[in-house]
């Protein structure tokens, strides 16, 4: 499932084609994805101009001029691609035009857009149909069930060591499962938690509360972890995300941060920490694979 860097990569790729474009037609290939489309979904969107593309955690936000926002989740296999309208010459805005790379029978949503002199299609493809699109009033986004209790973004100023100390204090739960709690940090997933903990030399099995002093202040290790979380997310976004299973960027290319994985999916490989000499291990926590080096992550 795409994590925050993958969704941010998609947002950045779609923005040149979608922002400022008018939705001439919205084609739905079926009545539902994971959930049914909202009633009169196409009718509520056609004729509207897209004013901006945003993101909250792992959700893409397509904001329309009339105060409605399309909340889109990619699910397990969803992806967007951008193509010039059939019969039109030239490339789509942002130079993201490319030949079809996915089976057309899984093209479930097609935005036919007018942007200046250009006509472009933005196509949502989802073989497993685990993604979804909802319509939400922009001024009620904070009340949307998936957003109501989300923690701060790992890329924003709200994420600080002091904040994490306030959430970790007294917690006996393992550090990894605590970081995966979307109520604490929004958008962090399995891959990037494993990588951040390795960079901070912290065991995913360690109790989260041990990183907080008896006075409720962050220990030096928690200050460092906060920085490492920011760093790993920034590095992944710069690399275009990680192309595991079905994720592709909007220009059809694959992200390449997976080539920089230090521990994730590296079971049995030598630890990359200089001078460590340990081996990456895999354990299962709450039904999910955790990768770490027991020799240097304490």
From Swiss-Prot:
Gene3D superfamilies assigned: 1.10.8.50, MutM-like, N-terminal
Keyword Iron-sulfur among UniProt keywords: no
List of catalytic residues: 2 (schiff-base intermediate with dna), 3 (proton donor), 58 (proton donor), 288 (proton donor)
A Pfam family reported for this protein in Swiss-Prot or TrEMBL: H2TH
Zn-finger (FPG-type) residues: 262-298
Binding note for cofactor: Binds 1 zinc ion per subunit.
Family matches, as CDD domains: EcFpg-like_N (cd08966)
InterPro entries according to UniProt: DNA_glyclase/AP_lyase_DNA-bd (IPR015886), DNA_glyclase_Znf_dom_DNA_BS (IPR015887), Formamido-pyr_DNA_Glyclase (IPR020629), FPG_cat (IPR012319), MutM-like_N-ter (IPR035937), Ribosomal_uS13-like_H2TH (IPR010979), Znf_DNA_glyclase/AP_lyase (IPR000214), Znf_FPG/IleRS (IPR010663)
Cofactor(s) essential for the protein: Zn(2+)
Binding-site residues for DNA, renumbered to this chain: 106, 128, 171
Molecular function, one GO term: 8-oxo-7,8-dihydroguanine DNA N-glycosylase activity
Sorted UniProt keywords: DNA damage, DNA repair, DNA-binding, Glycosidase, Hydrolase, Lyase, Metal-binding, Multifunctional enzyme, Zinc, Zinc-finger
PROSITE patterns, alphabetized: FPG_CAT, ZF_FPG_1, ZF_FPG_2
The enzyme's E.C. designation: 3.2.2.23, 4.2.99.18
Superkingdom as given in the UniProt entry: Bacteria
Catalytic reaction annotation: Hydrolysis of DNA containing ring-opened 7-methylguanine residues, releasing 2,6-diamino-4-hydroxy-5-(N-methyl)formamidopyrimidine; 2'-deoxyribonucleotide-(2'-deoxyribose 5'-phosphate)-2'-deoxyribonucleotide-DNA = a 3'-end 2'-deoxyribonucleotide-(2,3-dehydro-2,3-deoxyribose 5'-phosphate)-DNA + a 5'-end 5'-phospho-2'-deoxyribonucleoside-DNA + H(+)
Single GO BP term: base-excision repair
Subunit architecture: Monomer.
Family: Belongs to the FPG family.
Functional description taken from the UniProt entry: Involved in base excision repair of DNA damaged by oxidation or by mutagenic agents. Acts as a DNA glycosylase that recognizes and removes damaged bases. Has a preference for oxidized purines, such as 7,8-dihydro-8-oxoguanine (8-oxoG). Has AP (apurinic/apyrimidinic) lyase activity and introduces nicks in the DNA strand. Cleaves the DNA backbone by beta-delta elimination to generate a single-strand break at the site of the removed base with both 3'- and 5'-phosphates.
Alphabetized PANTHER family for the sequence: FORMAMIDOPYRIMIDINE-DNA GLYCOSYLASE
Protein name: Formamidopyrimidine-DNA glycosylase
